[in-house]
Amino acid sequence: PTILTLNLKDYDKVISILNSAKTCKQIDYNEISILKNAINNSLVGASKLLHFINPEIYAIWDSRIFKYLTEKKSTYGIADIDNYINYLKGLNEIIKNKNFGSLHKEIHEYLNHKTTAMRSIEIIMFLCNKLSINNY
């Protein structure tokens, strides 16, 4: 685990962005960049904070997810905000799929507790990765 280092130079902006994220607003590239710079200069750290603030909208972005999606052994590109934004867009497209609701329900039943739609997709990716099932 990485020790948290906060850069509070843009404290007011960071608080405003986090409040926006909490109220179901999808934040933009510049806002994610400000959060990234404030939290260890880490997109992974920023995504984790966003996920804990609003798990319905923000998924965690980490090396395991990046490697699964890109099929790369390296994490070169994990810090690219566009990659994270595209990941969130992709998750939202999956959630909109007419068949997703029944799959989401099956995951609830399997785990014996409710998860967010984003978390259900993460669980599927984790299991596919563990079982070496391709992402396509």
Regions found by a protein language model. Give the residues of each.
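C-terminal accessory module of base-excision DNA glycosylases/AP lyases that mediates lesion recognition
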Residues: D62-Y136
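Amphipathic alpha-helical segments within well-ordered protein domains
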Residues: I32-K36, L50, H108
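Amphipathic alpha-helical interface surfaces
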Residues: D28-E31, G45, W61
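Short hydrophobic alpha-helical segments that form membrane-spanning helices or hydrophobic packing faces
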Residues: G45-H51
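Long, highly charged, low-complexity intrinsically disordered interaction regions
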Residues: P1-I34
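Catalytic Zn2+-binding segment of zinc metalloproteases
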Residues: F52-A59
